[in-house]
UniProtKB/Swiss-Prot annotation:
Its main location: secreted. Belongs to the phytosulfokine family. Promotes plant cell differentiation, organogenesis and somatic embryogenesis as well as cell proliferation. Induction: Expression is regulated by a signal transduction pathway activated by auxin and cytokinin. It comes from Asparagus officinalis. This is Phytosulfokines.
Length: 75
């Protein structure tokens, strides 16, 4: 390969790397907030009168359906 082609490829590589970095800016360190949940205080009305396994299955199904229907679908 000629030196011009190599130089052009290196410039293109550096340009694409800089664009990739600019597309994903870092989040500030203070933007992450932790949420503390006290298990005894959590009350789920949908789980009243059923066992722990059934309650876990219902919560999992609800979370899965919520995840499916909040996705961005491009028809």
């Amino acid at each position: 390969m000629s030196s011009k082609a190599i130089t052009l490829l290196l410039i293109a590589l550096l340009f694409s790397l800089s664009l990739a970095q600019a597309a994903r800016p870092l989040q500030p360190a203070d933007s992450t907030k932790s949420v503390h949940v006290i298990p005894e205080k959590v009350h789920d009305e949908a789980c009243e009168g059923v066992g722990e396994e059934e309650c876990l299955m219902r919560r999992t199904l609800t979370a899965h359906v919520d995840y499916i229907y909040t996705q961005d679908h491009n028809p």
